Amino acid sequence: MVGCITDNPRLFLSRVDDSYRAGVDYVLGPWCFIGREEKFPTWEHISFQDAFENAVSKSIACDECSRLAASIIKILAVDLNQRHQRDYSFEYWWTLLIRPVLTTTQFLWRRWGTINSFIKKTHNEPLIVVVDPRTLDSEWKFKDTASLIYNGLQNEAFNYFILSLIIKALAPNTWTIVSTKNKLANISELPIPAVP
């Protein structure tokens, strides 16, 4: 007898709901239990997937993130000079852009690494993953670095959006990807600035 697809284990990218089955379903990180700790008290005993296998792979990732951030700033410097009809140096733009670019690069690299490591471990399993249907065309606007961090990188809906993009790009063909716009209550809302 062939099992129903709903019997397959699920991978939760964001907060678990009441249908979560401990020992059957997977969660990508501890953030999946925020506000649900009492409902699922054994969450603290789950071994979550790390983005890095060891200190060496973490060191390599740091170097790669730094190189990527530098190349992004070079591209942005040219674009911003043209847009504002200026001829500021790379160093000028570096000073202004390194913090948000490096912070974003590290965030994305870690999320990509976590998913990539998880896929290596579970690529043969018939998982079900519910993802955010939005694409890169979605607009997320941030006023400054603080807004980027609080309303983007630390925002549950934004994290779910980014993880969904990565999953949609990397998921093995054994996984069933289900798009839904109702996974998070604030999924269709733009972030509300937390800082003036």
Question: What role is predicted for each listed range?
Answer:
Residues 1-196:
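Catalytic-core helical/loop segments in enzymes performing group transfer/polymerization on anionic/lipid-linked
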